[in-house]
């Protein structure tokens, strides 16, 4: 067990453009990408925003192909991947767990569909090892 201590100060930064919870996030090239999650009254979000800490500004990027939550992001050389998740929840409706896999290209601001997961999953772990994606655990559709 490490006895290392971390000394740092918290600093308030600009709020996200839209209040949300349970979004996915990832740091690429010193910019924070925030995808999906829940907005007003537990409705899934289609938003993708990026925060640049150097300028202190948020920028809205192209909306997701559909509203989504319960995903993880993994980087690659020109963007990031996300897979599975809960789609288009409308309160008090039931979550729709999916098997979709997507790649987002940062330079092109574009999504590309990839082959589906073998089954519907949400909230699991996603990792990229070499050129392969690995999805671990997660909730399964009823």
Question: Which role fits each region the language model picked out?
Answer:
Residues 1-142:
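Kelch-like beta-propeller repeat domains
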């Amino acid at each position: 067990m490490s006895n290392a201590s971390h000394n740092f100060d918290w600093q308030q930064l600009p709020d996200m453009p839209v209040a949300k919870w349970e979004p996915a996030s990832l740091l690429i090239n010193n910019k924070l990408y925030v995808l999906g999650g829940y907005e007003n009254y537990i409705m899934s979000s289609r938003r993708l925003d990026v925060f640049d800490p150097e300028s202190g500004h948020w920028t809205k990027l192209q909306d997701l192909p559909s509203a989504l939550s319960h995903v993880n992001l993994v980087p690659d050389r020109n963007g990031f991947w996300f897979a599975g998740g809960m789609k288009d929840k409308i309160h008090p409706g039931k979550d729709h767990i999916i098997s979709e896999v997507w790649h987002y290209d940062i330079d092109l601001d574009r999504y590309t569909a990839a082959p589906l997961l073998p089954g519907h999953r949400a909230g699991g772990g996603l990792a990229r090892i070499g050129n392969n994606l690995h999805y671990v655990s997660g909730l399964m559709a009823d």
